[in-house]
């Protein structure tokens, strides 16, 4: 049993002072506000629930910053994708484990306590399945176990190079599965996370480019009631190609032909009409927004104000993992809306309300829904995922309650996280994960070889 005491903590009911939290077997057993610290309590100033990065491609952390040279032609998502394919083709299972471990350490240091790993690097370099088809999934699970982050594993089905069942490109060979192979992969992935505390599983049809309607219908039952994530309408070209194939836009097609509901998460959904935004919001599906990656790749800006106004739910993901941070993603999301609408505090819940708090609340609830977490936050029964902030940071000085969140997101950024408990285990202290040094050494050794 662990007893923590916080001068101020954000509970599901709102802020409370002098809060004692009792942790048993990795879960929150008791939350008692309005009490003085007892002998043996570990005391901290500000406590928040940990957030989820609902969308991650862990292996891409290894190539962060390596695609910033302009090519001969217009540089776009599609030219970046070619660089990503080349990097993916070189990686071994040991490389994937090393890169994912450091990534998850970094996520925890930034206040992410769960990750939705949209995992599509499945096979050996020649495209043939490993003897254990779940080899790469097992390496992701090992990385999660080593770091302490909670894992929602989302094995991705990827069969085609474009709409209408087009043949895949040679550089996509490590991703490609038949429906039968994917069923075996999902089964192996379940085994990989079976003993992992806090882990669960869903599926991720990669995109309408990569899966036919018949294949989509065939694989959805493999989710077995778990989350279903899919990339949708990230790029203008994707929308144009979908229109040429079907006469419909990607989100429009999904809403009319797939059983999209609260289990689903549409990643990006950047290029949508007003009608799509409203219909999407009504399904209860989550918009998986990855503002830093969307900016990095030149994708565009999601219609967040309109989506939230229609009652939509969103969470945040780190996607390409070019930069990892709770505050960074939420700040980029709000600043993108400010640039789009030429206004300030666009995603605030109303006059006199904190923008940072609104962003945080959406990310907490939307991330939990997208990753099938029934109980989340500082409440009895929830996994004990807790983040404390360093109130000595100059950007948090003199702040209280919602103003602390504003100071963290819009000013202090990545430097403000102090301690993190993941499943009741204190994995970060003084802003530093206990595995940071060894994880960095393994990562550096892998990446030096990969880029040589």
Segments the model singles out, each with a brief description of its role:
Residues 123-269:
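Metal-coordinating catalytic core of metallo-dependent amide/deamination hydrolases
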Residues 49-61, 227-236:
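Histidine-centered catalytic micro-motifs
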